[in-house]
Amino acid sequence: MKGKFIVFEGIDGSGKTTQINQLSKWLISSDLIPENNKLVITREPGGTKLGKSIRSLLLDTSIEKSPDSITELLLYAADRSQHINEIIRPTLDQGDWVISDRFCGSTLAYQGYGRKLDINLIKDLEAIATQGIAPDITFLLDIPIEESIRRRRNRKDDRIEKEGREFLSNVSLGFQALSEDSNWKKISAIDSKEKIISEIKSEIKKLIKNK
């Protein structure tokens, strides 16, 4: 049986890392994952050795000249293609589960809505990179822009996080639009951590029940 593919999306500061950690602990201790299978936690960009090098090119603020928007898009696609072939597809084919911090939704939100690149161009490129692999469920952890800024106040931002308020607003609007898809579940990330993980667990149980 093919494994489950779970993705977390959201603007920076939405609490994806916290909720991924909470969910992984719960799944490992539950009986939802078949006994002989495992759970793999990964991220984009940077889920593979090659991807880590691409991540550095994309996000490092010390690089003198940042990649232009199209170069940036192609680098994300290259990272995703390698990620699919090296990690995600082999893991799912073994019946194991995958949780990824970001996937295609981030590219559509950041490069499409944020950078204003052509959405259809991005979708065509994503089709090549993903080769038919799609999440079983995507959680959008939704927070207001002001809350994102407040939460990131004391941490060092990467190159994308340093973009201005207007860019972040456009990205947030992109995520809102994407979350209308039936495989997406939007969850308020300003609620308590306990309430958030409770909602996530409930959706995972529904996913298993309806498989």
UniProtKB/Swiss-Prot annotation:
Its ancestry begins with: Bacteria, Bacillati, Cyanobacteriota, Cyanophyceae, Synechococcales
Which species is this UniProt entry from?
A: Prochlorococcus marinus (strain NATL2A)
PROSITE patterns hit by this protein: THYMIDYLATE_KINASE
Positions binding ATP in this chain are 10-17
Q: Top EC class per UniProt?
A: transferase
Provide the function of this protein: Phosphorylation of dTMP to form dTDP in both de novo and salvage pathways of dTTP synthesis.
Query: What keyword terms does UniProt attach to this protein?
Result: ATP-binding, Kinase, Nucleotide biosynthesis, Nucleotide-binding, Transferase
Gene Ontology molecular functions: ATP binding; dTMP kinase activity
Q: Would the keyword NADP be found if you checked this record's keyword annotation?
A: no
Concerning Pfam families, the annotation shows: Thymidylate_kin
Q: What is its EC number?
A: 2.7.4.9
Its domain of life reads: Bacteria
Q: Report the HAMAP family cross-referenced here.
A: Thymidylate_kinase
Q: Which GO terms describe its biological process?
A: dTDP biosynthetic process; dTTP biosynthetic process; dUDP biosynthetic process
State if NAD is listed as a keyword: no
> Which gene specifies this protein's sequence?
tmk
Report the protein name in the record. Thymidylate kinase
Protein family per UniProt: Belongs to the thymidylate kinase family.
NCBIfam families assigned to the protein according to its UniProt record, in alphabetical order: DTMP_kinase
Q: Which GO terms describe its cellular component?
A: cytosol
Which chemical reaction does it catalyze? dTMP + ATP = dTDP + ADP
